[in-house]
Design a protein with these regions (language model features):
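Nucleotide/phosphate-binding sheet-loop regions of phosphoryl- and nucleotidyl-transfer enzymes
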Residues: 1-284
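A short, hydrophobic C-terminal helix/tail in secreted or cell-surface proteins
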Residues: 285-289
Length: 289
């Protein structure tokens, strides 16, 4: 993955590239190594889409504009008769890779790069460029962050939340950001990657059981349906939840501030991707603690 590393945290303002390094040859090798072609080609189609959006300029400028990749995904899902991306077959995922590459060629006149080094430099330059995108400039003005600070770019080994039902990805907070209540909370998705949690493609599930019950009550969902379709991590992955809960407490105690954390679970193993001091709207409870 290729991520920004600005001096001051700018959540969601900068661009990120995941699954970098994939091409047809690497994909075949990963299938042999993992025995999981669905995971490999899901990662591959995600990479081509993200690279096309961020590096090659196909990301829609306005919300009203049609994302060419999303239009292709919807068409392929309709052809296969499924509603969720995660239910696409391996053949459909392979088809998406080729259709995405064709869309890039058609709209930019350039081929999708297959050399991993070319991919890497393209991604690094794109993340540096994103420092000056419209939303980042506006955010810095609001937060009083100087443009001259610039950003670093971090190149990190990937861990994968989309390797199956024992993998997941999520975001969590060590306390309630709205009122400072000492209540661990957050959202996660099984068999997904980071952007899925905030993209609205699937309904994220709650980290804690109490959070899940509160969410279901607000949404008018019965307890039976909640447990069946939207179980909390505390219920669906109890051992991972215990580890996550212990570590979020440790991180808040260490930094002496509310923590905003991102994590991935790869085949039953928990990995922290990032933690940063969160923004409390009301801090008296946190101050008392």
């Amino acid at each position: 993955s290729v991520r920004s590393g600005a001096r001051a945290s700018m959540p969601g303002m900068m661009d990120t590239i995941l699954n970098l390094g994939l091409n047809d040859e690497v994909a075949e090798g990963m299938v042999k190594k993992t025995g999981n072609p669905h995971f490999v080609y899901d990662s591959y189609r995600r990479f081509v889409q993200m690279y096309g959006d961020v590096v090659m300029g196909l990301k829609p400028v306005n919300k009203e504009d049609i994302d060419p990749f999303e239009a292709i995904i919807e068409k392929v899902k309709e052809e296969q008769g499924v509603t969720l991306d995660k239910d696409l077959s391996v053949e459909s995922l392979k088809k998406l890779v080729e259709l995405f590459k064709a869309a890039i060629k058609e709209q930019t006149g350039q081929d999708f790069p297959t050399n991993p080094i070319d991919q890497l430099w393209g991604a690094i330059c794109a993340v540096f460029r994103s420092w000056m995108n419209e939303r980042a400039i506006l955010y810095r003005k609001m937060e009083g962050i100087p443009d001259e600070w610039g950003t670093a770019v971090s190149v990190m080994a990937m861990v994968f939340g989309n390797m199956g039902e024992t993998s997941a990805t999520g975001v969590c907070f060590s306390r309630d950001a709205g009122n400072g209540e000492d209540l661990f909370n957050g959202e996660y998705l099984i068999n997904a990657q980071g952007e899925d949690v905030v993209a609205g493609i699937r309904t994220p599930q709650q980290i804690t059981k109490i959070g899940s019950q509160r969410w279901a009550e607000r949404a008018g969902i019965s307890e039976e349906e909640r447990v069946t379709k939207y179980p909390s991590m505390e219920e669906a992955m109890p051992e991972i939840y215990k580890e996550l809960d212990a570590l979020q407490t440790k991180l808040e105690n260490h930094y002496r501030d509310m923590q905003d954390m991102e994590f991935t679970v790869q085949e039953g193993k928990l990995w922290f991707l990032q933690t940063r001091n969160g923004c409390l709207l009301y801090t008296s409870d946190a101050a008392d603690d």
